[in-house]
């Protein structure tokens, strides 16, 4: 596997591991952890605490970053490998080896704790087991109009990605490559409009526009469009030629973050569902485009830091299990989950340490070994033909699929 050694004049391929993308994963999960461990639990009793909470709430947007990254990585892999005889077999096998083991471990621990501990916000049976097992819990959340048990609440986004993994391999396989970019534009735009319409027509269900799959496809599609742009020789050369402009535009969008936070404070639903998620999709897509084309920028250097890359390696499991460990810490001592005292802070630090240690152990003992098995499942090349001709392009020769979350 090549790692961080390519020039940014080269087209990114799915067999090259880009260090900055690992750093972006780490940043995404760090944002979520900061929100759930600090911002969401602070009392709104003073101006300072309101200011801290109102700033750290930006951590919620880590999920939007994950969606853009997933769209970029998965669509890139699918496009690079759509000519393989074992296209579906290898893709789904690798996805299963990556996604299912940490997810299954979470559900097992969650169901055991639900049976042992008193029912409360974090543990309960509000969402049936089969919904988690079939990755349909996001639709059950819409039905309930609440998160369900907090210990497994973040799995709604995993459900969306799993549904994406099922549908888009078929789309990429069947649709000619030249039609994929406009198709992603249409799907992404439709998702943006449908999300706004849903909130306008059904404001009483604030969860639907947040967790419904077809209302959250814009980030995944934007990442996919960037993957296609990187695999088009003309578009890639254009991006390289205008890399400084990309960086400036990205900086301009980032400078808009304080206004976004103020709007989010005063009107969360209106902000997020009418324009907030769209803004974040553009911001994070520009950020990804910037690091792909500017390896010498300060942003790229920051994302190559060992801390962020190490966090990126365990980001999936840490994202999955951290609410469960927060809930476990407070439930065992019979306290409400909040950050009002030193004892609360101690419980949260303990939950954070357990989250990181569990995630690291899971990665070393289980996930890394299963990923190695997945990488031994190679895509087989098909002989020349119409589909092979359709793949002709800058990255049709890529050999592996190392860039999988």
Language-model segments: residues:
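Alpha-helical transmembrane segments of multi-pass membrane proteins
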Residues: 23, 93-106, 172, 309
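Hydrophobic alpha-helical transmembrane segments that constitute the membrane-spanning cores
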Residues: 105-113
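Alpha-helical transmembrane segments in multi-pass integral membrane proteins
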Residues: 1-20, 27-30, 34-60, 74-89, ...
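Central hydrophobic cores of alpha-helical transmembrane segments
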Residues: 183-191, 306
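Function-critical hydrophobic alpha-helical transmembrane segments in multi-pass membrane proteins
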Residues: 148-173
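Short alpha-helical catalytic segment bearing the HExxH-like zincin motif
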Residues: 22, 91, 155-159, 165, ...
